[in-house]
């Protein structure tokens, strides 16, 4: 498992300090980018009749609730940088939930790319190569646990 250095943790915490206070607007940037990268992902949000296209989806209350939840997961990861393993059960379950609704693991990579895009567009010149790498490392730890949960859920369905 990858490890975060103390420097990485500091970079992540410092960059998240302002972003975490405005979760929904930054989450909308993340999801706007995600839907630009793969518009087909819109079909996964069938709980809302307002998800015919990205702008409709991004303004629906149900979807904004999902945006908030995603940003809270990022917030939890940042808050637990010293002990990310304590989120293991939560992340395994999150992976299972994503598998159950038809999300494939390749989409996790697109979310990571969209997260980096949001960070870059929000932080401007403060977005450095070191900061990017720190966030990539943290995200890979989170996604690794989610992927294990996703795979376990798939095993249970095939048995």
Swiss-Prot record:
GO MF term list: GDP-dissociation inhibitor activity; heme binding; metal ion binding; nitrite reductase activity; oxygen binding; oxygen carrier activity
Record's protein name: Neuroglobin
UniProt key word Iron: yes
Annotated Globin domain residues: 3-151
Similarity remark: Belongs to the globin family.
Effect of residue 13 to A: No effect on membrane transducing activity
Pfam families, per database record: Globin (PF00042)
Keywords, comma-separated and alphabetical: Cytoplasm, Heme, Iron, Metal-binding, Mitochondrion, Oxidoreductase
Reaction catalyzed: Fe(III)-heme b-[protein] + nitric oxide + H2O = Fe(II)-heme b-[protein] + nitrite + 2 H(+)
Functional description taken from the UniProt entry: Monomeric globin with a bis-histidyl six-coordinate heme-iron atom through which it can bind dioxygen, carbon monoxide and nitric oxide. Could help transport oxygen and increase its availability to the metabolically active neuronal tissues, though its low quantity in tissues as well as its high affinity for dioxygen, which may limit its oxygen-releasing ability, argue against it. The ferrous/deoxygenated form exhibits a nitrite reductase activity and it could produce nitric oxide which in turn inhibits cellular respiration in response to hypoxia.
Subunit structure: Monomer. Homodimers and homotetramers. Mainly monomeric but also detected as part of homodimers and homotetramers.
EC number: 1.7.-.-
């Amino acid at each position: 498992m990858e490890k975060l250095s103390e420097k990485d943790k500091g970079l992540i915490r410092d960059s998240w300090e302002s972003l975490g206070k405005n979760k929904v607007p930054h989450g909308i940037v993340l999801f706007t980018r995600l839907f630009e990268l793969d518009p087909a992902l819109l079909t996964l949000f069938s709980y809302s009749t307002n998800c015919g296209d990205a702008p409709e989806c991004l303004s629906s209350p149900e979807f904004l609730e999902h945006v908030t939840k995603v940003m809270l997961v990022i917030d939890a990861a940042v808050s637990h940088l010293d002990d990310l393993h304590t989120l293991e059960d939560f992340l395994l379950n999150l992976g299972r939930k994503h598998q159950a609704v038809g999300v494939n693991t390749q989409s996790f990579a697109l979310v990571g790319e969209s997260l980096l895009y949001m960070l870059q567009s929000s932080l401007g010149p403060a977005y450095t190569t070191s900061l990017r790498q720190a966030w990539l490392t943290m995200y890979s730890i989170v996604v690794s646990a989610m992927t294990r949960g996703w795979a376990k859920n798939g095993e249970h369905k095939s048995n």
